[in-house]
Amino acid sequence: MSFTVAIVGRPNVGKSTLFNRLVGKKLALVDDTPGVTRDRRPGDARLMGLTFTIIDTAGLEEADEESLQGRMRAQTEAAIDEADLSLFVVDAKNGLTPVDTALAEMLRRRGKPVVLVANKSEARGSDSGFYDAYTLGLGEPTPISAEHGQGMIDLRDAIVAAIGKDRAYAKEDVAVTDVDIPPSESEADGEDEEPVYDDTKPLRVAIVGRPNAGKSTLINRFLGEDRLLTGPEAGITRDSISVEWDWRGRTIKMFDTAGMRRKARVTEKLEKLSVADALRAIRFAETVVIVFDATIPFEKQDLQIVDLVLREGRAAVLAFNKWDMIEDRQAVLADLREKTDRLLPQARGIRAVPISGQTGWGLDKLMQSIIDTDRVWNKRISTARLNRWLETQQIQHPPPAVSGRRIKLKYMTQVKARPPAFMISCTRSDALPESYTRYLINGLRADFDMPSVPIRIHFRSAENPYESKKKRT
């Protein structure tokens, strides 16, 4: 993008609504409750021929530096410093407050271009608030309605005037990127060579877990900066915030998510929106890191989150955080491994890494586990290898007999990856017990080195081409 714009203002003036309008989708949570946005959220904006990076920010308030509101303010000030231009949003419907005046003074001291935006100008009685905005000394306010999309052309013109026409419409060099070409039919059948894992493609990783497990602290440690709001208060993160960084030459896009509590405890509308946002991040990700608090691991909600991730078909890695607070580490690690195998039988072999987001201990090992797990998630196995394996499995443990006739597994092929899914042609597929499916899945994990990912097997009854002729005679 050619330039960066920060949306700033006091709480509940419509900043996130404007952000969603400019990016063309509902990325930021919107609610009547003040202070919904806490972290700074970037997005790709398009406005009447302009393309730029837009940053949604927390509502600015006067607050002590160490308080939650003070730390939110620091995040917003960092966004202002990062941006080339600020959109200072005021509420034309409800008028100015002393906080607006203080923020205008702060923006003037920064010395960067500012566009004054009078939102909610469609409301009855908004004229008074619009004209009051002139008193802020930031030039002519631009009247808009972020909710209804009114005034967007005027906003575009104000941005161009503030940043300059050359900068606003500057052309960027377009990087040549790899195109993901689907395999041909012969490649999909796997008769030729199995495809090589591409470790240069960007990787999408969601960080999930219970509230206060240390998810945001972990991402900040990866980035080497206080990019995300953290603190002792549970439930600080509300939006799913994405950040990009480079790990050993590979682009990693990480999604910080709101803490996920048991459904019965989620009563507030805003928390329900936050959890729904976290679920969307899981579905968009390729690999999901489930962060456990190592001091109180394996709460019921931890297990439910792991089960949810696997049911969504994502690759999963466990991170036992706060390892710096553990004293007898060897004994605790052995106990965690035993509980992982016992309490998560559906995730046999899942990678589990002890880490400390506070000190950075174990993060390289965690990242390598993420890469290794993604490699398995993308794995394809040739049809020839699968059918040799299937024959061996039936010799070692034959399928059960039904009405005196043994079920025969005739043919196996991989129908997709991400996650790996297989189709087996057999007789009497409806009579094959679930226990035999588990036997095959466990065999695939062990023989083809496929831990940490869900494996799906679909059975199809083999058709007898002479069956219809027999019925006619």
From Swiss-Prot:
Keywords: GTP-binding, Nucleotide-binding, Repeat, Ribosome biogenesis. This is GTPase Der. CDD domains: EngA1, EngA2. The keyword GTP-binding applies. The lineage of its organism: Bacteria, Pseudomonadati, Pseudomonadota, Alphaproteobacteria, Hyphomicrobiales. GTP 1 binds at residues 9-16, 56-60, 119-122. GTP 2 binds at residues 209-216, 256-260, 321-324. GO terms for biological process: ribosome biogenesis. HAMAP family: GTPase_Der. Associates with the 50S ribosomal subunit. Belongs to the TRAFAC class TrmE-Era-EngA-EngB-Septin-like GTPase superfamily. EngA (Der) GTPase family. It comes from Rhizobium etli (strain CIAT 652). One of its GO terms (molecular function) is GTP binding.
